[in-house]
Amino acid sequence: MPMSEANDRALEKKLNWLRAAVLGANDGIVSVAGMVMGVAGAGADRPTVLLAGIAALVAGSISMGGGEYVSVSAQRDTEISYGRTAEEVNAHPWGAAWSSFVAFAAGAVLPLIAITGPWEAYRELATVLAVVVALSITGWWAAWAGKSSPAKSIIRNVIISLLTMGISYAIGTLLGVTVL
């Protein structure tokens, strides 16, 4: 295999891993933050918010891992059907699945800690701040690794997360009921 082709394959493998890790972490952060903000907006107490967040973490991790496994398996099967040998294909379904599962769970822990911490009166604000900081870091990291604009990546991440949390919180507030 020529050196440039080997370099291309190494870069492809690195970018696939990075994509899965960033997508998994961002999805964990944003999905679970949206869930817990919606439940908090409905007026739920700390244990209820924590339970909803844990359920979202578990379901999301399994979903991301399973989805990544299916996606990478299909990619691998397609490449092999077009004549590439199994050794030439950089698609590793189980590795990708595990990476997405762990990345989602790692990202999801942050909003859970922020919303259920000892700062009850500021739980929503703490969550928003923690999520903005975390997504700024993942946005910068993705831009650095991909040699693209950190500002664009960070702004994109932060806007999506603020919209997700704001809409979820508003829906929770509008539809929430107080349980006596």
Task: Put a short name on every predicted segment.
Residues 1-110, 114, 118-131, 141-142, ...:
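Hydrophobic, small-residue-rich transmembrane alpha-helices and their short perimembrane loops
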Residues 64-68, 72, 148, 152, ...:
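Short helix-terminus and kink motifs of transmembrane alpha helices
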Residues 151-160:
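Cytoplasmic-side transmembrane-helix entry/capping segments in multi-pass membrane proteins
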